[in-house]
Amino acid sequence: MNKNICVCGCNGYLGNALVQRLLKQNYFVVGIDNDVKLEWLDECNSVSALPILSTLEKCRSFRKMGKYAHYNIDISKDINRLREVFKAHNFDTIVNLAQMPSAPYSQIDLEHASYTIQNNSLGTVHIAWLMKEYCPDAHIIEIESMGTYNHAINTEIPEGKFTFERKGRSSEPCIFPRQAGSFYHSAKINSMYFLDCCQRFWGLKSTTINQGVVFGITTPEIEESGIYSHLAYDSTFGTAVNRFIIQTMMDRPMTIYGNGNQKRGYLSLNDSIQCLMLFIENPANDMRIVNQLADVYNINQIIDIIKKIKPESTSINMKSPRAETTDDFYYNVCTDALKSFGFKNTRTIEDEISSIFKIVDPDYLNKEQEKFVQWK
């Protein structure tokens, strides 16, 4: 098994959990993170619902768990320093999680949109070129988003490439059409097409994961170590389930955008890491495009689940600040790749919601009023 792995964005919500899983399974892990996310969070007054360790404290803890090296590098800018890392380590796998993770943040203004596209796209290009130069047989995994699709496209969303027909002629396999929901999602689409170029030009092996909304705070490794990821609950960086739970804990109504019929794919943090491990352990032979989710819910269904667990919770409908359809629509996503590798959902949304209510201390939360970024 290939055991030499680089995790870019190792301090993030997914990266922190993935590093601990890899170390537990005896991988040699090189973590790269320049901690710029702390600046984004501070700018938006986004505090964690849980205490988190500093990077130095994490590094010390990770090195006690296993073989771990850490580099403070901006992969979108510091090409020479990134090159030195690739020279020093013969990577088998690179997992790129080093992207600004918020659609609302990318919509704040021109500067934030421009920054998001540069930060999230150039990192992919730099990694791919350095793989070509120093580890051409390695496998890169990137987390993209189900939000790169038109959610209301009214057909099954496939995996891989597809062929289309027009006037009796069939095309060569193509990437399924995308329709970004934000500038953040546009940058995700860019990264996918860059990896497609690298496969066609150089034979680079890659897995592009279109992931649903992730919720939850624990994995078995986090439960053992107590080293939590940043749990955002503001409207800019907090994801739907996590944000609703914390709103309830602060005795605030859960804010539903529009009529709440927006359907999305969801999976727990633990299942997201399970999926990543499956793709690490089963590298692609060329370019692999997969969808990653466990269940599909609309917002109203999630609200109802939380209200069953906490009957005192309330909700309100507000005009959606986003440019999205809030009407009911057909939503069916193919997830055959995960099934072929034996993926099984390990944590229900009910269990994970109950767990967050038990673990998070309400007195630790920031009670300042939320601010909403307007798309239009």
Features from the language model and the residues they span:
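C-terminal substrate-binding subdomain of Rossmann-fold SDR/epimerase-dehydratase oxidoreductases
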Residues: 24, 126, 248-376
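Residue-level signature of the cytosolic catalytic core of signaling kinases
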Residues: 179, 233-237, 295, 345
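Glycine/proline-rich active-site loop of Rossmann-fold NAD(P)-dependent oxidoreductases
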Residues: 189, 201-204, 216-242, 250-252, ...
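Short, conserved glycine- and acidic-residue-centered signature motifs
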Residues: 120, 237, 331
